[in-house]
Every structure is written in C-alpha cells, then in structure tokens.
C-alpha cells in the first residue's frame, strides 16, 4: 500500500517549483497531494497535480492580526480534517506563512514533518517549526 504525502506550498515560484519537482519524484511510489494558496495556483496545472486549497491570510497587517489568528485557527481545524480524510502520513513544507495551518495540524497528529528551505537564509515559518521537523533540506 502506498503512503500518503502532503506537500504544502504557495506564494511565489521559489516555493512552488521545488514542490512540483518533489511531487513528480514522489508520485511514482506514493500518493501525493499538493496544498497551496491562491497565489501558488498560477504555477500549478490542476490537470497534472492533485490539489487542495488552503488560502492562509498574510500576517503583515497589524490591524487585522486578531482576525488573521482566528482565520489561521479555522484553517488549522480544516487542515486537521484534510489530514484525517486523506490519511496523510508525512507532510513536506516548502515554508512560507501558507504552511502554518497544515504544520500545526500535522503536529497535532504527530506526523513526520519535513521542511524544505528554498533560500540561503532560513525563513520565518521554517524557523518557527525547526524543532518540530524530522529533517530540514536546504540548498548549499
């Protein structure tokens, strides 16, 4: 039986393109789903990839911060349902704020979390979850 993997990505091509390459590699031996936000959709073909949309709001507007935290809480609950429904065993994140709800949900289920850092400097989301991950993959 194939394992179920979820790759969470979104935002810019710098996050999404590595996720698509990993998807192509893993789909030969596992069931793979990509979760992205609306911005990441422009880099993904719905006919090629199995997709789930988790549209996490940006964390950059201090006036809407309480609403943003409520939204992330709601999306974490939605992510819990997704992980359970799809029987996900491992979560791979390319970082970014859009990965927050899914990684929180994966922590609740004690799933293996793998982080990919596509930049030379560790991003804030990956730094936040560094102690929760099984491995972090970086470019050299």
PLM features per residue range, with description:
Residues 31-33, 39, 107-140:
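Active-site-proximal region of nucleotide-activated glycan assembly enzymes
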Residues 39-42, 90-109:
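An aromatic- and histidine-rich active-site surface loop
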Residues 10, 96, 117-120:
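Histidine-centered beta-alpha loop that forms part of the nucleotide-sugar donor binding/catalytic region
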Residues 50, 90, 134-135:
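Well-ordered beta-strand positions
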Residues 15-26, 39:
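Short amphipathic alpha-helix
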Residues 7-15, 91:
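Short, glycine-rich nucleotide/cofactor-binding loops
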Residues 61-90, 100, 108:
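An amphipathic, basic-hydrophobic alpha-helix
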Residues 2-10, 28-71:
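Conserved nucleotide-sugar phosphate-binding/catalytic loop shared by glycosyltransferases and other
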